[in-house]
Amino acid sequence: SDYLQLARG
């Protein structure tokens, strides 16, 4: 779970 990747989505 990456919160940074979540911001990218």
Swiss-Prot record:
Compartment list: Secreted
Coiled coil start-end: none
Biological function: FMRFamides and FMRFamide-like peptides are neuropeptides.
Taxonomic placement: Eukaryota, Metazoa, Ecdysozoa, Arthropoda, Hexapoda
Swiss-Prot/TrEMBL keywords: Neuropeptide, Secreted
Annotated Gene Ontology cellular component terms: extracellular region
Family: Belongs to the FARP (FMRF amide related peptide) family.
Entry annotated with the keyword Secreted: yes
Domain of life: Eukaryota
Chief site of localization: secreted
Gene Ontology terms describing biological process: neuropeptide signaling pathway
Keyword Secreted (UniProt): yes
Protein name: Extended FMRFamide-2
Disulfide bonds: none
